[in-house]
Structures are given as C-alpha cells and as structure tokens.
C-alpha cells in the first residue's frame, strides 16, 4: 500500500507545483480592444480636406464645395507609403472643423457630391478604405464634433446631425479600428450665414455617453480617441512626445474633451481609475494641412527618430500625419522623410542581443513565470515574483562582451501597469555600475544609453504599484545616426557644430576644402568674425563611416551691429536665430554695421513661425555712410516667397556702406513686414 501511495503523493505535489496561480491584476486593466490597439503602436494620419484648398489650418465654414478639386488624387499612393513606412493603419479627416465632408452624406450638401472632383460622383472615404484594405492597413476615421458651417451647431438638432453622419461612416465602410474625436470645439464660424461666435458646454453639449454607446453598437472593436478617451487619450502636445513618466491610467471621470487645463492630466496618473493610454500625434511638417510654404520644413531624420523614441519608447502609440497636397498626393519630400525613418528604425532594432543571452532572476513566482520567458518574443508570457516581492532584479549574461546602446522593456499590461522605478547596471570586475534609470515602463519603454561594453547587465525593479510583471527584455546596438552636423554661429561670431548623436566625432574645414576624417577635429566652439565657408562631417569611429557634409556660408559676424529702432524687439532681426522674428510697424529695418563695408548684397529670411505673416514681396535696399543721406542701390521682388519662404540671397553692384536699410514696398498679405533674419554679403 505504501508503494502505491508514495508515487501518487509525488505526482500530486508535482501537479500542484505546476499550478502556480498568476498574480492578481492591478486595476485598471485594458480591455480586449485596447490590447489589440496597443499592439499596433505606429500608424498614420491623413489630413486632406477643404483646408488643403483654402490653404488654412482651420477653415471658417464659409468655403464652397467647388474649391475641393484634387487633380491627381491617389489613395493607393497614401496606403503604399504608409505600408512601406511600417505603419499598421491610417486615419483620415472625414470632416474637419469647417464642416466639409469627404463622402456623399445624405445629411448635408456641403460635401464632395457638390464638388468638381469626380464630377460630383466621388466618395473619398470609399477610395481611402479600399486602398487601406488592399495594403493590409487598418482604417480609422477622424470626425470633428465642431462644425463651423452647419446652421444648427450649438443647438440640440446638430447632435442628431452629428450622430447621423457617424452612423453613415460606421456602417457603410466596414471595420473601423479608431474613431478620432478632436477636442477643439465652439467659437467663431459661418454657421449657415449667421457669421457669429457660438460657445457650447464642452462637457455636456455633445451628450458623449450616448454618442459613445452609438459607436460601441456600430463598431464594437473601434477605439475612441479624445482628450479624455474613453479608450485612448491625447498626449497633451502636438510634438509627438510622451513623457519620462507616462501612465496609461487616467482619472477618467474627471477629464473631458476640450477641458481647459488638460495639460496637468497629460502624463496620466498613478492612481488613475480608468485604462486610457496615450497616443502621441505629430505632423511630418509644422502644419497639419498642406502648405507649399512648408516644403522646406519637413522634419529631419534626427527629429523623427527623437519622436519615435519619445513616443513609442515612452509608453505611447505614435500617430504621424501626412498633409496630402492639392494634387491629392503625399508630397515627395514627406515620402522621402518617412521612409528614411522606417529604414533607421529597422536598422536600430535589427539584432536583439538578448535573444541568445541567458537570463537569471533574483526570484520568480515558479514554473510558468521564470526569467527565460523574457526573451521568447511572446508578449503573453512573462516573468514575475511571489506576492509581496516588490523589489527584484534580472541579470542578462551575453556570454561575451558586447556593445549596446538600447534597452527595451515591456510590462505585461494586461494585468495593469505597475513599475514606478527601475535601473540598469553593468558588471565591472565583479561589481555593478549604474548606467541609467527610469520611472514608468508600461507597454513599451526604450532607454537610449551611451555605447556600453559589458558581458553582464542587470535590470533592477525598485518600486511599483504591485509586483513586477515583465513580458520582454531586449538589448540592441543601434548604429550611429550619420546625418550632416548642424553648424550655427552666434552674433558674436562663436561657431558651434553639433552631430546628431553625442558619440560621433566631428571634423570640419574653413579653408574651402572638403573636411576629412582625422583632420581638424571639432572640440568646442571657435570664433569666425569674417566671411568663411564652414563644412563639417560626422564620423562613427567604430565603423569609419561618415555622414554627408554640412556646409554653411557665413559673412560678417553681427556682434557690433545695432538696429536703429525704438522697439527693443528689433534685435530679433539679427540674432542668428531662425525661430525668432520681428514685426516692423514702419515696414523697414535699419542697421548700423559699426564700420564701413564693401557691400555686395544682402540676405533676407522670412519669419519661420507656423502661421506666417508679413513676408516681404517687393523690396528696396538703401545704403548710407552717415545714417542721414540714403541711396537706393537695388529694388526688386522675392519671387514665390509665399510658397517658398527660404532665405533670399540678393547680389548688387558693390557699394560702400556703414548703414543699410531694407524697406518693404509690399508684403504678400498686406500685413506689416516681418524679418526673420537679415544679413549682408561682402564677398
């Protein structure tokens, strides 16, 4: 009898050991639709509507359907680019604040059915949906609750109109993965000819609970976005950045779309009652809609990569906008930029050094929750600790010394977001040295660290709302971002050269010859007061690869110049900062150069702010030796400056001058002349 009972007892104990209970969830937790959405991480926005043709960001509502007339519209081009960029879906502006709609809605005449496009028979939402389906992309719909065209906006009747249109969008086009409600609402507008200001109670007017219920009924799997959710929230800025500390938890009952002090809620709250994760939205240009004058302002690769790491790498999804142009195409420069970003992301995460490494935890919960699950590429398996064991660590042994600069960690957020503090260390001669530390992790956290050599690293989980529940740990060595260095000079003549990454070496030249690796290394700012051409390259010492060269042609430094004006802000016209500008009430700029120069021309940079004003269209340049007697030495126009507001270089016959005055004879919009930056040409 004993011989029978003993094996049975062992079998029972073994069975019990395998049945380790999972940890209790830490509320709130995501819904199934939120989990599916979180896995997308990266998708695109398409801003294309009446604003594209009125050249506005926010239309007033008085536009005419006849204005909407793209000449080469190709939604398949949009979908192809998004797919090649690695995006998982696209969201389109079905209706923006101006009220014009991109489908033949039976509830309004302010739509594509009364435009010349496709002879009034087109349905842009249908073309968009078909293109997305062809390329395997999920479909999202942006719908602005505010309508500056509709005569009933601000009245109960408008809410019926809004819900009728949502019903059209959510029943006629198949599965929708995200419905995007803008937080801007209420203000001046055309409103069917009333041409007035209408204010609404942003909390109660739209009857959001009923509207949300409608969306749930028609599209059960769709995420709803607004400032406050209910499924996904605005990150609180339009820069594409989440935060060092970003919680997916939100005090959902205290937040509503359009609330005035939303910024204090943007990072989420540790004690939030609802699971409403962040979505980081940003345009690939300054504006959301296409403007030809922004063709030179497409975000650079370093800017886009910073956005990637500060959004997806900080517990947020990333929504990048394409301002489709008047042809109906994503502009070539936008396509080039987004595909370069896609290639760089792929390069950065090409090899997971942790895949072949061994993992050992200071403790674990038992079978099914051990450290070897941390590199199995399966989000649904995870390592965790016994109940009450808040602090723990995981060692990663690569088996040999490796170089890395990225640490990726994912929490199994299906059981709630937990980690409040963690650190990364490397082993050096038997002791541990801290490399970096962080706060929240969430669905994904990516630490960007300096190039580090180590055979063993340790991740310490220091504090949390509950025991750590970690799904994946990845370690990567991202190649250096080899981009032309940024060369700048202060008015005092101090030149600085900055590479895209701090680990890169920089070499430069000022003699007109091309810079060469190993020759004339940049070690700090240096002085250049006279005209000079400075060129620079960035070099990755590990690979020997170099960036394309950067080049800047400087003329006289401006440290001794004086702007003759009673307006103290006039100095902004010569402060060597492209982001600043000065508005001249007298439509001119007068400068004392501090010495007589042999003037051979001048440069004028229009203001580079997002909303331009006062670009000089026609100019006159005058010179003087005493500041009293003036002579006009040239007069002309800055051709196409409205659409291409880049620095203008104007050469003149040589003239002696100590004082110069640039006069605006006409601006592009009739407003007072603005000066982004003024310079002289003396060589």
Where are these regions (language model features)?
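Short, compositionally stereotyped local motifs that mark structural "simplifiers"
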Residues: 7, 477-588, 598
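Ser/Thr-glycine-rich phosphate-binding loops at phosphate-binding pockets of nucleotides
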Residues: 91-94, 547, 624
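Positively charged n-region of N-terminal signal peptides that target proteins for export
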Residues: 1-4, 82
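Short beta-strand segments within Ig-like beta-sandwich modules, predominantly Fibronectin type-III
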Residues: 436-440, 514-522, 639-641
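Aromatic, loop-rich ligand-recognition surfaces of beta-strand-rich domains
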Residues: 333, 340, 344, 348-351, ...
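C-terminal motif of bacterial Sec signal peptides marking the signal peptidase cleavage site
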Residues: 14-15
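Mature catalytic domains of secreted/periplasmic carbohydrate-active enzymes
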Residues: 19-390, 395-396, 408-410, 417, ...
């Amino acid at each position: 009898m004993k011989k029978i009972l003993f094996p049975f007892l062992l079998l029972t104990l073994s069975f019990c050991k395998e049945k380790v209970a999972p940890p209790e969830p830490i509320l709130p937790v995501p819904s199934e639709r939120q989990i599916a959405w979180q896995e997308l991480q990266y998708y695109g926005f398409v801003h294309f509507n009446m604003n594209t043709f009125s050249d506005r960001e926010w239309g007033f509502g008085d536009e005419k359907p006849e204005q909407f007339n793209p000449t080469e519209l190709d939604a398949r081009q949009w979908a192809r680019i998004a797919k090649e960029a690695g995006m998982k879906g696209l969201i389109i502006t079905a209706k923006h604040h101006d009220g014009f709609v991109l489908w033949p809605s039976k509830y309004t005449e302010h739509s594509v059915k009364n435009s010349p496009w496709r002879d009034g028979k087109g349905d842009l939402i249908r073309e968009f949906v078909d293109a997305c389906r062809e390329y395997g992309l999920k479909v999202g719909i942006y719908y602005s609750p505010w309508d500056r065209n509709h005569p009933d906006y601000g009245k109960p009747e408008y809410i019926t109109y809004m819900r009728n249109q949502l019903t059209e969008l959510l029943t006629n086009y198949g599965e929708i993965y995200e419905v995007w409600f803008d937080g801007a609402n209420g203000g001046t507008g055309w409103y069917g000819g009333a041409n007035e200001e209408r204010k609404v109670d942003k909390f109660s007017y739209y009857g959001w609970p009923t509207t949300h219920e409608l969306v749930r009924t028609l599209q059960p799997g769709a995420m709803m976005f607004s400032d406050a959710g209910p499924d996904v929230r605005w990150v609180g800025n339009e820069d594409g950045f989440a935060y060092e500390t970003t919680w997916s938890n939100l005090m959902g009952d205290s937040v509503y779309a359009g609330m005035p002090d939303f910024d204090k809620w943007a990072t989420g709250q540790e004690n939030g009652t609802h699971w409403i994760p962040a979505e980081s939205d940003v345009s690939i240009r300054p504006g959301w809609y296409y403007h030809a004058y922004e063709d030179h302002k497409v975000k650079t690769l370093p800017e886009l990569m910073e956005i990637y790491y500060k959004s997806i790498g900080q517990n947020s999804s990333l929504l990048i906008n394409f301002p489709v142009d008047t042809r109906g195409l994503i502009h070539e420069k936008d396509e080039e930029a987004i595909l370069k970003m896609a290639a760089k992301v792929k390069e950065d995460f090409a090899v997971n050094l942790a895949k072949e490494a061994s993992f050992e935890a200071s403790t674990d919960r038992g079978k099914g929750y051990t450290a070897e699950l941390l590199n199995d590429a399966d989000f649904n398996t995870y390592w965790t600790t016994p109940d009450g064991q808040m602090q723990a660590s995981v060692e990663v042994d690569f088996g040999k010394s490796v170089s890395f600069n990225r640490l990726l960690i994912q929490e199994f957020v299906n059981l709630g977001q937990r980690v409040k503090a963690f650190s990364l260390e490397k082993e050096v001669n038997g002791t541990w040295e801290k490399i970096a530390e962080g706060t929240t992790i969430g669905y994904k956290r990516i630490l960007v660290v300096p190039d580090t050599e180590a055979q063993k690293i340790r991740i310490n989980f220091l504090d949390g709302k509950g025991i750590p529940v970690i799904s994946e740990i990845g370690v990567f060595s991202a190649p250096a971002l080899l981009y032309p260095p940024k060369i700048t000079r202060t008015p005092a003549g101090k030149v600085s050269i900055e590479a895209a990454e701090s680990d890169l070496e920089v070499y430069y030249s000022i003699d007109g010859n091309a810079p060469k690796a190993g020759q004339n290394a940049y070690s700090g700012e240096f002085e250049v007061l006279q005209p000079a051409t400075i060129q620079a390259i960035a070099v990755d010492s590990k690979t020997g690869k170099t960036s394309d060269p950067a080049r800047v042609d400087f003329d006289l430094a401006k440290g001794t110049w004086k702007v003759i004006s009673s307006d103290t802000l006039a100095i902004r016209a010569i402060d060597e900062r492209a982001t600043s500008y000065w508005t001249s009430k007298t439509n001119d700029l007068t400068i004392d150069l501090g010495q007589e120069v042999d003037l051979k021309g001048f440069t004028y940079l229009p203001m580079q702010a997002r909303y331009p004003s006062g670009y000089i269209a026609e100019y006159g340049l005058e010179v003087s030796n005493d500041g009293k007697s003036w002579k006009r030495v040239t007069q002309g126009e800055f051709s196409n400056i409205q659409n291409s507001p880049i620095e203008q270089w104007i050469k003149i016959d040589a003239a002696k001058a100590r004082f110069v005055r640039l006069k605006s004879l006409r601006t592009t919009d009739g407003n007072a002349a603005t000066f982004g930056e003024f310079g002289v040409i003396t060589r």
